């Protein structure tokens, strides 16, 4: 079971890690972030767009409304700076959500339809865990693309967040 304390830490971790990867990608030379690469979403920005789309999908599930998406990513992506602003708003929404949910609410099951078809059911806590894990997975894709561009991104591991940010804020 995901507790309120864990949900709050995880949503803050996700926002912190997103800031690291977005600032690293933003510092690249012009055109490098959208240069075609042999990877699932073809470039860094489109890869970063995918977790944002999924965050929006699950936001709609949590709010009990239709999300309007027919695919797990959009055909094109916005410019990096526009995407980053949208991701920050979304990260804040999830941090605020985790701050107001109770343990009982985190354990409540949300029913939804998967974009690819089929019934889904996850607790609010499982949704938060999934979104944090999902974003980490795709930041890893971007970190690999950064390494291909001879850029070594700053560590955005949970252990680093716990050591440098979370425990410092708590203590």
Predicted segment positions?
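Carboxylate-rich helix-loop segments that flank metal/cofactor sites and access channels
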Residues: 103-115
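N-terminal beta-strand motif that seeds the catalytic metal site of vicinal oxygen chelate
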Residues: 3
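A structural signal for well-ordered alpha-helical scaffolds and beta->alpha junctions
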Residues: 7, 18, 80, 87-91, ...
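Helix-adjacent hinge/juxtasegments
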Residues: 65-106
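Short, contiguous alpha-helical
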Residues: 8-73, 114-171
């Amino acid at each position: 079971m995901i507790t309120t304390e864990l949900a709050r830490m995880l949503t803050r971790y996700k926002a912190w890690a997103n800031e690291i990867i977005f600032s690293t990608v933003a510092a690249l030379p012009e055109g490098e972030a959208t240069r075609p690469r042999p990877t699932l979403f073809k470039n860094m920005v489109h890869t970063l767009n995918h977790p944002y789309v999924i965050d929006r999908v699950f936001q709609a599930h949590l709010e009990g409304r239709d999300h309007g998406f027919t695919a797990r990513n959009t055909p094109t992506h916005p410019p990096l700076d526009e995407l980053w602003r949208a991701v920050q708003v979304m990260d804040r929404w999830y941090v605020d959500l985790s701050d107001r949910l109770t343990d009982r609410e985190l354990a409540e099951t949300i029913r939804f339809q998967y974009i690819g078809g089929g019934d889904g059911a996850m607790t609010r806590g499982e949704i938060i865990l999934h979104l944090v894990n999902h974003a980490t997975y795709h930041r890893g894709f971007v970190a690999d693309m950064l390494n291909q561009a001879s850029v070594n991104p700053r560590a955005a591991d949970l252990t680093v967040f716990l050591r440098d940010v979370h425990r410092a804020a708590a203590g």
